[in-house]
Amino acid sequence: MSAIVDVYAREVLDSRGNPTVEVEVYTEDGGFGRALVPSGASTGEYEAVELRDGDKSRYLGKGVLKAVENVNEIIAPAIIGFEVTDQVGIDKTLIELDGTENKSKLGANAILGVSLAVARAAADELDMPLYQYLGGFNAKTLPVPMMNILNGGAHADNNVDIQEFMIMPVGAKSFREALRMGAEIFHSLKAVLKEKGYNTAVGDEGGFAPNLKSNEEALQTIIEAIEKAGYKPGEEVMLAMDVASSELYNKEDGKYHLEGEGVVKTSEEMVAWYEELVSKYPIISIEDGLDENDWEGHKLLTERLGKKVQLVGDDLFVTNTKKLAEGIEKGVGNSILIKVNQIGTLTETFDAIEMAKRAGYTAVVSHRSGETEDSTIADIAVATNAGQIKTGAPSRTDRVAKYNQLLRIEDQLGDTAIYNGIKSFYNLKK
C-alpha cells in the first residue's frame, strides 16, 4: 500500500451558497480522493463544532478560510507519510491533533473533509468502489429512502411547525423501484398542491414548502398525493416526520411552542399528540419528537410508541457514542440518525452505527440541509448495511447525487443487491 504524499483544502460553496471545505488527498502510487463537507440549519447543541471565520466582510461571516488553513498548515504535515489505508490511525491522529471534546480547535469541517478524502483515496488506489472498500464483500443492502417532500420549521418560511414530512416506499422490491415511487409521488404532490392553490417552490432539501393551515393538513395532503400516484398509504408507502422539537422548545417555560398552530404543549401533551397522529396516519418514524435535553419526555414517548414507531434521535444523540450509550441505558428512542459532520470522522461514524446495531437500534444515514455534490453518504449507507437513508426529495442536484450513486451501486451489485423494505424496521412489532 502507498503513503499519503499531499493533502490540500480549499473553500467552495454548498447548496445554500455558504462556504464549505473541500479536501483532496494524493498518494505516492497515484491514488486520489476528494471530499466536500455538508452543514446543518437546525443543529444539535452537542454537535462537533463547524469552524466559521466570523469575518463579516466575507460571506457574512460564514467563510471557512481558518478551517482550510488548519488542513493545509496543521493536519497535512501530520498525516503525510501515513499509509492511506490506515483510516483508524489517521482518524485517531486527527482527534488527538484537535484535542478538544467537540473538535472546536481545528473544526469538525476541517477534520471530516480529511477523513472522508483519505477513504476515497484509499478506495481509488485499490481500484475498489468506496462502499466495498468501507464495508467489505458483505456490503450489499440498499437503503430504504426517507424522502423529505414537505418542509416546515427551520427548513422553510411557512407556518408549518414540523420540519420535515417524508415518504418511505417500503413496498418496493428494489431501490430503483423505491426511487421511482418516490419521484412519482413527489410530482403527484406538486399537482395536488397546485390544485389547492398552494405555492410549489422547494425548500433547502428539495421538498415543497407551502403555507398550509396546519401540520395535519400536511399529512392529509401527502396521503392524497400517494393515492393520486396510484400507491397504497400504509402498505406500499409509509410516512415519517422530523419534528426537530428543539427548535420548538422554550427553555424559559419548559414547553413546546407550535407557533404555526398557535398552541403551547407540555412534553406529555406532545406525546399524546404523536399518539393521536400515529393512530390516524401510517406514520412509521418520528425523529426528535422532543427537545434534545428532555430525556424524561423521550422516555415517555419511547414507552408509549417505541414498539410500533421508529423513534430517531438526531439532536438527541448527535452521532455520538457517549450520547447514544446514555440513550440505550435509559431506554430512550430506538434509532439513531447518522450525520458524518455531527461527529467529524469516519471511524467515529462507524462506531456509532455499530453501537446502535448491537443494541437493536436502527441507524438512518443522513444528509444535512446544506449539502454538496459529494455522494459519500450513499456509499456509507451500503457499506454499513444501515438499511435506511435520509437525503431529501428527488429534486435538486445536491440531493439527487446521492440517489444516483445508489442506483449505480445497485447496478454494480446486480443480483446480490438486497432491498429490505419494511423489514428494515427490524425492531418494531407491527
Swiss-Prot record:
Belongs to the enolase family. Mg(2+) binds at D242, E287, D314. It comes from the Bacteria. Its main location: cytoplasm. SMART domains: Enolase_C (SM01192), Enolase_N (SM01193). Its cofactor is Mg(2+). It holds the Pfam family Enolase_N. It is found in: Cytoplasm; Secreted; Cell surface. Disulfide bonds: none annotated. GO terms for molecular function: magnesium ion binding; phosphopyruvate hydratase activity. The lineage of its organism: Bacteria, Bacillati, Bacillota, Bacilli, Bacillales. This is Enolase. GO terms for biological process: glycolytic process. It catalyses: (2R)-2-phosphoglycerate = phosphoenolpyruvate + H2O. InterPro entries: Enolase (IPR000941), Enolase-like_C_sf (IPR036849), Enolase-like_N (IPR029017), Enolase_C (IPR020810), Enolase_CS (IPR020809), Enolase_N (IPR020811). Pathway: Carbohydrate degradation; glycolysis; pyruvate from D-glyceraldehyde 3-phosphate: step 4/5. Gene3D superfamilies: Enolase-like C-terminal domain, Enolase-like, N-terminal domain. (2R)-2-phosphoglycerate binds at Q163, K339, R368, S369, K390. The active site is at E205 (proton donor), K339 (proton acceptor). PROSITE patterns: ENOLASE (PS00164).
